[in-house]
UniProtKB/Swiss-Prot annotation:
A Gene Ontology cellular-component term: large ribosomal subunit
MF GO annotations: rRNA binding; structural constituent of ribosome
Basic and acidic residues biased stretches: 10-22
Protein name according to UniProt: Large ribosomal subunit protein uL24
Function per UniProt: One of two assembly initiator proteins, it binds directly to the 5'-end of the 23S rRNA, where it nucleates assembly of the 50S subunit.
Taxonomic source organism: Natronomonas pharaonis (strain ATCC 35678 / DSM 2160 / CIP 103997 / JCM 8858 / NBRC 14720 / NCIMB 2260 / Gabara)
Recorded family membership: Belongs to the universal ribosomal protein uL24 family.
Amino acid sequence: MTRQPHKQRNRQERAALHEKQKQVRAPLSPELREEYGQRNVRVNAGDTVEVQRGDFAGESGEVVTVDLRAAEIHVEDVTQETADGEEVPRPLEASNVQVTELDLEDEVREARLESEEDNE
C-alpha cells in the first residue's frame, strides 16, 4: 500500500465500479442512525437527503441519479443555470449530504439494513 498522495488519488479515480460504491456513502440523520444502528449508508436514487455543505446547504430533495464513475449524486431541485439559460442538475459529493429518508423498495437493501441493526 502506497502512502504517496498522487497514487492514492489515482487509485480512487481509477477504481472499479464495485469499489466506487464505497465513495457514495452519506451519513444518516440521527433518527435513522438510532433506528438502524449504523452511521452512514450508500446513497441510492429515491432516497431523500438534506444538503449540509456548499451553496445549497439546507435544501432537501430526492436523489435523482447516482453517478458511480464520478462518485457524484444529483438531487432534485439542486440545479444551476447554464450560460444559455438551461437548468442542469448540480453534482454533489455524497459526503456533503445527510440521508433523512431511505428508499426501501429494494428488499435486499432493507434486509441488509435490518441485519446490521440486529448485529448491534
